[in-house]
């Protein structure tokens, strides 16, 4: 049971300490909380998962240490609303304190990547921005679903933020965190979305040039405010129109994403890449190919970095590389030199052979 700020339990929360991991050994998801208090109009999570329940900082730190001791170099922090971590249990350190605790865990083990996912924009503070900017093991990456950019849609969706406030937040993030990679998601075809609303969203995406963005067509959910709106023919967006809007937005974002990686290749950007897996079937004679990820790429949702190497590499190895080409969403790199190599953790290679 997780205790609330008033000392009363707010729900049962299974510990993840001994769970069976489905991810590769060198990276893992680390759940900081369960449930959500935001109650967006389109979402059923509060009714299914319940109110937000944060793990204690001690529990999150202990699990992080266990995962890193088992070979994980990258920890991806998840929860339905990571921004609000600690609020329900009265931990005034909040998300900055959580990130600082996880950074200490990584630094004590020689380094690592702490990546923040599922942040909620309306409560994202300057202290949270500063934590990402200054903590050495916290990756300069932020996954923050924005859902829309039209004020009327943000109101209908009950997102508790305006378009201008969103722009101000993104400007502060970009200013304080050089090289920040921003991932977001949007919903199109939500009941009440007009062509004007959609055009405002397209203009917002053109303006902000997100490194990564996804788009989903609205999905009807009974029992939600959006679901009730969707029953009104005047508000309902036809499925074919929602599909058109999804395609248009993703084509725009595709162009932006291609340009981001092409620019890195053109300037021969030097960057650290975490090796994920070999792709020997595609390798040329005398060359080894691997998929990996740089700071701007979260596992399973973002693009990959293709590593072309004359030597064998190991999953979990952190390699200093130079960008040499791009292939649509993916960056193509070569290892910088032998002295630029480092393994993710002591004995990491031996552990991965088990």
Residue ranges and their predicted role:
Residues 1-85, 127, 142, 164-175, ...:
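Proteins enriched for Cys/Gly/acidic motifs involved in redox and nucleic-acid/cofactor modification
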Residues 69-198, 206:
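Conserved SAM/AdoMet-binding glycine-rich loop
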Residues 86-110, 157-160, 220-255:
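Radical SAM enzyme [4Fe-4S]-AdoMet core and its adjacent flexible, acidic
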Residues 229-354:
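Terminal RNA-binding accessory module
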């Amino acid at each position: 049971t997780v205790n609330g700020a008033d000392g009363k339990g707010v729900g049962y929360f299974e510990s993840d300490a001994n769970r069976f991991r489905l991810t590769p050994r060198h990276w893992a998801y680390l759940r900081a909380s369960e449930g959500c208090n935001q109650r967006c109009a389109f979402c059923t999570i509060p009714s299914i998962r319940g109110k937000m329940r944060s793990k204690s900082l001690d529990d999150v730190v202990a699990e992080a240490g266990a995962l890193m001791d088992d070979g994980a170099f990258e920890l991806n922090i998840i929860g339905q609303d990571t921004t609000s971590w600690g609020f329900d249990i009265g931990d005034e350190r909040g998300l900055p304190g959580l990130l600082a605790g996880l950074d200490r865990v990584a630094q004590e083990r020689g380094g690592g990547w702490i990546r923040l996912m599922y942040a909620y924009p309306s409560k994202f503070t300057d202290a949270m921005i500063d934590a990402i900017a200054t903590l050495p093991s916290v990756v300069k990456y932020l996954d923050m679903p924005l859902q829309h950019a039209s004020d009327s849609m943000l109101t209908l969706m009950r997102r508790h933020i305006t378009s201008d406030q969103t722009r101000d937040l993104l400007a502060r993030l970009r200013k304080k965190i050089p090289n920040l990679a921003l991932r977001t998601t949007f919903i199109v075809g939500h009941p009440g979305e007009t062509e004007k609303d959609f055009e405002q969203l397209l203009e917002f995406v053109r303006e902000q040039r997100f490194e990564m963005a996804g788009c989903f067509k609205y999905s009807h959910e009974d029992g939600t405010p959006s679901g009730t709106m969707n029953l009104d023919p005047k508000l309902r967006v036809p499925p074919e129109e929602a599909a058109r809007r999804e395609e248009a937005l993703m084509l725009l974002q595709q162009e932006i994403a291609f340009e981001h990686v092409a620019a890195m290749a053109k300037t021969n950007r030097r960057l650290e890449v975490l090796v994920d897996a070999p792709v020997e079937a595609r390798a040329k004679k005398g060359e080894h190919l691997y998929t990996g990820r740089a700071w701007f790429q979260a596992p399973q949702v973002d693009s990959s970095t293709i590593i072309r190497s004359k030597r064998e590499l190991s999953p979990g190895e952190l390699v200093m590389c130079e960008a040499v080409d791009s292939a649509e969403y993916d960056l193509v790199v070569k290892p910088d030199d032998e002295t630029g190599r480092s393994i993710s953790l002591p004995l990491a290679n031996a552990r991965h052979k088990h």
